Amino acid sequence: MKSWLLFFLFIINFEANAQLDTLFWFVAPEVAQSHGDRPIVFRFATLNQAATITVSQPANPLFPTQVLNLVANDAQTLNLTAWIDQIENKPANTILPYGFQISASAPIMAYYEVTPTCNCNPDIFALKGKNSLGTSFIVPAQNFLNNASYARSGFNIVATQNNTVVTINPKQAIVGHAANIPFSIVLQKGETFSAEAVSILANQHLSGSTISSNLPIAVTLHDDSMSGAPYGGCADLMGDQIIPNQVLGSEYIILKGYLNGPDKIYVVAIQNNTQISIDGVATATINATETYVHTLSSPTVLIQTSAPTHVLHTTGFGCEVGGAILPSIICTGSNTVAFVRSTNEFFALNIKTGVSILLSRIFSKTLIPSSSGIITSKIMRSGCV
């Protein structure tokens, strides 16, 4: 039986509930079935209030609206696999009705998980609620690992209101559109669009692509079956909801994972002449849409920038690579996080010293000493080929 874990982070002089909300928008990426793309699930958790959760696709009458009732301090999983062909956002360069609207009567946590029965290509997409919605985005992406021949990378857009005009300027060629030539689409509420890189090569990924809209949208990044060859083999999915430009930060602390080699950190500027300092040392200056790559071999690093930036961290264990878009230390995610450990593979918590944490498993609790600290903002899973 899969068990839920709740992490309660007690942070002095700090309050942030970046993933605790009553309204979420999400579009699920296409994941290669040949490597493992199912089951797919939503996982929900409540805190001290009961909640009724409604999951719908406003633009798709063929998807049956789902209603879940959770008591306080509860968690439930909604298996979506039966509808996977009207959930995964394919084909690319096509307006589709596959966007999710999730509403709750009280604040909840939510994430989407690809959890293949083969344990071979899983990932978690933490839903960020209002912090995922905006009208201006720059896409962060890794440029070190190629995709497998059957997989692609890209980003996916969902509209939250009717008559949403979205302008996309792809940094590299995507299906149906050349690089550096802006184009616009019009989406209705719940409609989606997939921008997919035409190449599997890492240097043809879409970092620095820009997305703007007249009304709020949400954007999902995906990088399917990244080759872990530099670390000894494997191939794994990475994805996350992108943070809009208006809520980015300029100071980040990153903890190294457990790969057979260094982690990679990708810093993407949204303003010209953005200066980057690594552990207090001025290192580089980049312009808007440009990417600076830092190779992380030490246990931790402090990255500071003169203007807000995106920071994408790729890490994992062994040759299994995953990744996440990081929150700045001004907004370090939620003070409570719930998740399911879906496999019995390697599992670790990276803990920064200085703050007490209460680790609560249903009906059993362990206190992590105050000499420990805060859990990193996203706990990732990786699988095997």
Where are these regions (language model features)?
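Bacterial Sec-dependent N-terminal signal peptides
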Residues: 1-22
